[in-house]
């Protein structure tokens, strides 16, 4: 993994108190061989996204014949990151967001998820607590389904039992045939893990459950397995591949201060799910990665990161999987102005790859669901699904 550029409060305070002295040392002793202070100052401003202030420090290391090789490599990487940021700012991509009428109301709607055939749109709606749902500081959250009617989607209705029965439910994924649904359920429990600082503290324990549609009804929610859902980890935001064999999700191993990473698990021959596997580099970093969305092409992964170079906060990225070795290529920032200085996440793409959907408050104080035409370079591969049943004619 790469070195972390986030600035913990203690480090910021320590650097702030020494900043003027370090700068003075560099001014007085420009040939001082130990470039520790120069690198620290560059990283300090880099972490604050003050790239114009950080750039001269990295350039100084690059130009110094006596600088250590590891410092030169690090400075060179930082300068490349700065150039990437400048390119993002100056080169905008096509983006005309349109509020999705029907599902969008005066309440908050977010975490959209399309069924792979685009017939249904699932999302979370936050409403006053006199409505059914999981209580949340005077509001409740409903898991809602909207049906496509011609070129529009309906306003949506709450999903029936076993959904919306009191727990927080959201962050779903659904199979190609619309008959297997994965959902995140959050329960507040005391922490009993190895992190002594958090032992006994209450935390939001997120787990992934599934339900199958049989005879027109959804079955009772079941855990995907105790090897994935544990009482000491946060496992959420599932995304199932088109063949139902790989499940991607977000995991926090240490709920108190741990990083978010994207994991996957593989379906076993007996139908169970294998142990979680961290996707590793180049997807995961020392920062946070979350909200994975594996498109139905099974090769294009969209996700959010606050560490890969971006516009600020959480940015949307996409990465293509190599079909031969099943490894992901380096992720690409989806671009400005889709990404902003705020947080972007909960991003999904239609089956044909032409439209993207996300939750945003850009139209006013309420979160609503928006869609836009996704530009060509960021689209997944074109795919075709055939609906129907195989019958033996003999």
Regions found by a protein language model. Name each.
Residues 30-36, 47, 51-53, 63-389, ...:
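Short, conserved micro-motifs composed of acidic
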């Amino acid at each position: 993994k790469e070195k972390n550029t986030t600035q913990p409060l203690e480090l910021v305070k320590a650097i702030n108190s020494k900043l003027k002295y370090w700068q003075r040392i560099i001014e007085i002793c420009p040939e001082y061989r130990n470039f520790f202070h120069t690198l620290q100052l560059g990283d300090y401003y880099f972490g604050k996204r003050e790239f114009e202030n950080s750039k001269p420090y990295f350039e100084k290391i690059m130009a110094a014949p006596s600088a250590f090789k590891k410092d030169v490599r690090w400075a060179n990487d930082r300068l490349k990151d700065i150039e990437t940021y400048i390119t993002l700012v100056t080169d905008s991509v096509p983006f005309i967001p349109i509020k999705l009428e029907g599902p969008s109301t005066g309440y908050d709607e977010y975490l959209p998820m399309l069924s792979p055939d685009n017939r249904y749109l699932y999302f979370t709606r936050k409403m006053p607590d006199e409505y059914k749902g999981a209580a949340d500081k005077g509001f409740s959250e409903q898991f809602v389904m909207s049906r496509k009617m011609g070129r529009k989607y309906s306003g949506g209705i709450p999903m029936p039992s076993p959904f919306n029965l009191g727990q927080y439910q959201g962050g779903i994924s659904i199979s190609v045939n619309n008959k297997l649904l994965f959902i995140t359920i959050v329960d507040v429990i005391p922490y009993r893990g190895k992190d002594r600082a958090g032992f006994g503290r209450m935390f939001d324990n997120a787990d992934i459950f599934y339900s199958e549609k049989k005879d027109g009804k959804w079955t009772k929610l079941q855990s995907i397995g105790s090897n994935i859902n544990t009482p000491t980890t946060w496992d959420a935001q599932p995304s199932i591949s088109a063949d139902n064999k790989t499940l991607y999700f977000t995991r926090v191993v240490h709920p108190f201060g741990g990083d978010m990473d994207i994991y996957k698990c593989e379906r076993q021959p007996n139908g169970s799910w294998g142990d979680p596997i961290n996707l590793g580099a180049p997807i995961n970093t020392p920062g946070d990665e979350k909200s994975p969305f594996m498109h139905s092409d099974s090769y294009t992964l969209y996700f959010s990161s606050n560490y890969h170079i971006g516009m600020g906060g959480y940015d949307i990225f996409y990465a293509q999987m190599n079909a031969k070795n099943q490894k992901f290529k380096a992720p690409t920032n989806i671009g400005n102005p889709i990404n902003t200085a705020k947080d972007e996440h909960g991003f999904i793409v239609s089956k044909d790859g032409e439209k993207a959907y996300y939750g945003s408050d850009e139209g006013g104080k309420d979160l609503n669901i928006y869609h836009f035409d996704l530009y060509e370079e960021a689209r997944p591969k074109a795919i075709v699904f055939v609906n129907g049943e195989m019958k033996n004619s003999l």
